[in-house]
Amino acid sequence: FAGIAVMSEEAADIPWDEREQWQTYWLIDPLDGTKEFIKRNGEFTVNIALIHRGEAIAGVVYAPVLNTTYYGAKHLGAWRQDGQQEQPLQGCKMPRQVPIVVGSRSHLSPDVADYLNNIGQHEMLSVGSSLKFCMLAEGKADLYPRLGPTSEWDTAAAQAVLESAGGKVVCYDSGLPLTYNQKPDILNPYFIATAPGWAK
């Protein structure tokens, strides 16, 4: 992988006129879920994504305390590995009558509260860090509305896992796929992530 650029929070000051030339690069978050890490609840992750032409095409999400790794790649599928045991991720193929919405233990904005009111009856599952996407990929939840600030390194690896399992991550306002390195700042727009059964 020599010669492939690397972007992370620690390297966030790379100038846009340099970054905009990148076709392929690694996007890394060595500690996603800082609040979860401080609380010592185990729900923090290490995220590594491969971005190609604005798309997260491969990703690894590692939860050290849980000894669990989620990984996936475009056209190849997605898997969960616990120790030596590996299983494919296929999500829940049929939408539940009462959707399970995954959110953060540390963030629940008024916009998300309004969104939840609009979807009607639902169950709420609180999980930290990129594990929210992974719950969708596993079929343990259906929807993840993130109507608050995130950075590109917070989402890319887990988006790759979820989409490799058949899910989707789209911008809240436009409905277009969430993309990377398409503008000078590294902040994501609001987005909605959906499990395979909801990814219409």
Question: Where do the language-model regions lie?
Answer:
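Acidic beta-strand-loop-alpha-helix segment within the catalytic core
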Residues: 48-134, 182-200
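Flexible, acidic active-site loops/lids enriched in D/E/S/T/G that coordinate Mg2+ and/or position polar
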Residues: 1-52, 60
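Conserved beta-strand segments of alpha/beta enzyme cores
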Residues: 5, 120-123, 168
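Short, solvent-exposed loop/turn elements at beta->coil junctions and helix N-caps
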Residues: 10-16, 131-132, 176-181
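Oxyanion/phosphate-interacting regions
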Residues: 114-118, 134-200
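Short loop/edge segments at beta-strand edges and connector loops
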Residues: 8-10, 82, 128, 173
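Conserved acidic residues
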Residues: 23-25, 57, 99, 142
